[in-house]
Design a protein with these regions (language model features):
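Extracytoplasmic ligand-binding site segments that recognize negatively charged/polar headgroups
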Residues: 1-127
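Ligand-binding "clamshell"
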Residues: 1-4, 26-29, 140-152, 212-217
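Binding-cleft/active-site segments that stabilize strongly anionic ligands or cofactors
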Residues: 42, 159, 185
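Short, hydrophobic alpha-helical packing/hinge segments within bilobed ligand-binding/sensory domains
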Residues: 56, 119-122, 138, 176, ...
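Periplasmic-binding protein-like
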Residues: 97-106, 144-168
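A ligand-binding cleft/hinge motif common to bilobed small-molecule-binding domains
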Residues: 124, 130-147
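Mature extracytoplasmic/periplasmic domains
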Residues: 167-227
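Conserved C-terminal helix/tail region of periplasmic/extracytoplasmic solute-binding proteins
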Residues: 223-288
Length: 288
């Protein structure tokens, strides 16, 4: 449970841009303060991929088979398929989720791996050529490599906000609120953004940031790009459970392939048991 914040202790909230103050995940903004934000995009190695990448369909390109990485978490992975299909990432229609799962199953044979933080090592070394990831982290890789490019796919993408909250059980709530207030100071927010790589929800902080960062389309995408984003919301339990089941099927190869695997295991065990029983029976005859 999260504590309701006392904003008398957070006067610097006034520097947070208005568009961040009434989020879907915290109506009225009573329990959280926006800390950073970003989008999801694709980064790719131009040493191996010469054509310009513009859309999520690149993650299904057989020319890159064995060199494609994919998110190892269901919400982000499904979202990519949903953007390709023109769906809402918050759809309540189970048929939509099943269609997205089918698309992910089509992709699986050409993937190198489902990964998260390992993306950095694999992309830097050239072991992988293309991968989706969060813009703030991707920017670091782009800055450190002349051959890595980043793009926000034209079909749209996820917009996310990291927020600061205080547990209702906190015994130092006032001190925590004062710390949040410190982080909301524009100069501190600007320095923090330069360090962590994720965009600050404070326009006033840009005055204290490197000009290259402020003008970077990775850190601060255009209004046109931002208008084509969607924000995740919590889904009903029945939908969440179905997503978990579908994700397991995607990772395991689908219900049909899972059934084959189970049949093979059962067959192996049957043969093993038969051999054991035969040996026991043979030993009894020899002793007799």
């Amino acid at each position: 449970m999260l504590a309701e914040l006392d904003f008398d202790n957070i006067p610097n909230l006034k520097y947070i841009d208005e568009q961040f103050l009434d989020p879907d995940y915290d109506p009225g903004g009573k329990h959280s303060v926006p800390y950073t934000w970003g989008v999801v995009g694709l980064f790719y190695n131009t040493d191996y991929i010469e054509e310009e990448i513009t859309g999520w369909d690149a993650l299904w390109n057989v020319d890159y088979a064995g060199k494609i990485l994919m998110f190892d978490n269901p919400r982000d992975a499904f979202a990519i398929a949903q953007f390709r299909l023109g769906q809402s990432v918050n759809t309540l229609d189970l048929a939509d989720w099943e269609a997205a799962a089918d698309l992910l199953k089509v992709q699986k044979p050409i993937l190198q791996a489902y990964v998260m933080d390992q993306i950095f090592d694999k992309m830097e070394s050239g072991e992988a050529w293309i991968a989706p990831y969060y813009a703030g982290d991707a920017a670091i890789l782009v800055e450190n490599s002349d051959s890595i490019e980043f793009v926000v796919p034209e079909e749209g993408t996820n917009f996310f906000v990291d927020a600061i909250c205080i547990p209702v059980t906190s015994s130092h709530k006032r001190e925590a609120e004062e710390y949040i207030n410190f982080l909301c100071d524009p100069e501190i927010a600007g320095a923090n953004m330069d360090y962590v790589g994720y965009s600050t929800p404070e326009t006033a902080a840009k005055e204290y940031m490197d000009e290259e960062v402020v003008e970077s389309p990775i850190h601060y995408p255009s209004e046109e790009v931002l208008a084509n984003t969607q924000v995740f919301v919590n889904l009903p339990e029945d939908v969440s459970k179905r997503i978990d089941t579908l994700w397991a099927e995607v990772k395991m190869g689908g219900p049909g392939e899972s059934a084959v695997l189970v049949a093979i295991i059962v067959g192996f065990l049957a043969v093993y048991v038969a051999i054991i029983l035969y040996k026991r029976h043979k030993r009894k005859r020899e002793l007799a």
